[in-house]
């Protein structure tokens, strides 16, 4: 029971409650609209210039934005299944619990590579076979990671074009990994457990169809594009590349953060340079679906190609941007002289 003298107070309170409910309803609607907008708007960063197109995000999703037959060459080094942890992101293919889980995730990307790569052109994949650890699986051995990648590309009707082996110093590998099979004490105890070092590979896959734009090299003028003399070609044609400088890489340390669990090393610039030289023309577009800190794109721009690079991890993507910009600026400076 409210006295007549308090009726106006009650009326005022009820009006304020009504206005408050109305305001909360409008705020709720506004919040819902904003959430919908956020879902529609791409939350990732893009950088587009005349020389490169950089995308931050999951390569499987972002690659769908690349037009059909847009790339003249694809070069990348995928996450090495469960061997390394590159970031703490759920979409990171390095964050898998086993080999088969990586295979499942990677299988979604290969159709996008096939769609975006021009007919008759090359996709070069850097990889290595993976050590099987006794603590995980109860025995020591090797997993045929390169063979798995080959089989997956063949399933998408790529042509297995070639493979080259990148020689690695087994002493360096032994010092870095302390692998039982490389230790000298192993041959004293039981040599059956000793093994050779694990090299890197570059697997070359050719897309179906005819290449409509030939890549024609010449050996008469080193100042002209596509200069490839016979002595250099003999190095390229070797099934083992002995002369790759493993220390010639882009700086990466500032791209690491507290969530990185293991050592990560970017792809050697020598390897990238050789692949780009052999399988693309100046002015063509080179794609990397695991852009990292931008090694493939940096070298592409330096060699007067265009780059399309996708990277998930923000700290790597920031370095990717910087390295692409540096390459573009260096080219501009050189063109002045």
How should each PLM-predicted stretch be described?
Residues 14, 19-319:
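Core catalytic lobe of class I
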């Amino acid at each position: 029971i409210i006295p007549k003298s308090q009726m106006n107070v009650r009326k005022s309170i009820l009006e304020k409650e009504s206005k408050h409910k109305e305001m909360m309803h409008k705020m709720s609607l506004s919040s819902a609209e904003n959430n919908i907008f956020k879902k529609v708007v791409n939350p990732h960063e893009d950088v587009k210039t005349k020389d490169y197109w950089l995308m931050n995000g999951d390569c499987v999703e972002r690659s769908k934005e690349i037009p059909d037959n847009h790339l003249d060459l694809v070069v990348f080094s995928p996450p090495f299944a469960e061997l390394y942890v590159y970031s703490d992101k759920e979409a990171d293919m390095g964050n898998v619990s086993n080999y088969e889980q990586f295979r499942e995730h990677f299988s979604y990307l290969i159709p996008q590579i096939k769609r975006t790569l021009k007919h008759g052109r090359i996709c070069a994949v850097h990889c290595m076979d993976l050590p099987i650890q006794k603590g995980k699986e109860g025995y020591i051995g090797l997993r045929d990671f390169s063979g798995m990648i080959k089989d997956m590309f063949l399933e998408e009707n790529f042509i297995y074009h070639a493979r080259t082996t990148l020689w690695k110093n087994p002493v360096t590998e032994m010092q870095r990994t302390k692998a039982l099979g490389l230790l000298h004490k192993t041959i004293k105890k039981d040599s059956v457990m000793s093994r050779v070092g694990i090299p890197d590979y570059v697997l070359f896959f050719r897309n179906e169809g005819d290449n409509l734009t030939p890549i024609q090299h010449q050996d008469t003028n080193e100042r002209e594009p596509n200069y490839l003399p016979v002595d250099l070609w003999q190095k390229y044609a070797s099934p083992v590349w002995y002369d790759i400088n493993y220390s010639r890489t882009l700086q990466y340390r500032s791209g690491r953060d507290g969530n990185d669990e293991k050592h990560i090393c970017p792809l050697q610039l020598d390897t990238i340079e050789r692949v780009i030289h052999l399988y693309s023309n100046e002015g063509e577009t080179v794609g990397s679906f695991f852009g990292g800190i931008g090694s493939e794109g940096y070298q592409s721009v330096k060699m007067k190609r265009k780059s399309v690079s996708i990277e998930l991890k923000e700290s790597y993507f920031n370095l990717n941007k910087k390295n692409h910009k540096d390459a573009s600026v260096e080219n501009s400076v050189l063109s002045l002289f």
